[in-house]
From Swiss-Prot:
Residues 1-83 form the YcgL domain. Transmembrane segments: none annotated. SUPFAM superfamilies: YcgL-like. Coiled coil: none annotated. Disulfide bonds: none annotated. It comes from the Bacteria. This is YcgL domain-containing protein XCC3997. It comes from Xanthomonas campestris pv. campestris (strain ATCC 33913 / DSM 3586 / NCPPB 528 / LMG 568 / P 25). PROSITE patterns: YCGL.
Amino acid sequence: MHAYVYKSQRKQDTFVYLATRDDFSVIPADVQARLAPFAFVLDAALTPERRLAQADADTVRAALASHGFYLQLPKTVVLAGECDYD
């Protein structure tokens, strides 16, 4: 299975994987409104052996097969000073 990876031009560290190149119609309109425009990053073969930096390849393949896209959001890091311990 191939995935076409695009970077959101509006939200840092946010990527969309598509099953079909440039087929943004599979992405819900409200998601597109927040993240578009997108810039093409790479065409990747998602084999069972393939490792991805921020996502599980099996999860991405399943989402592409069922929905036609996978949304990769940035990791959230909570710093100790930002926590409310009360």
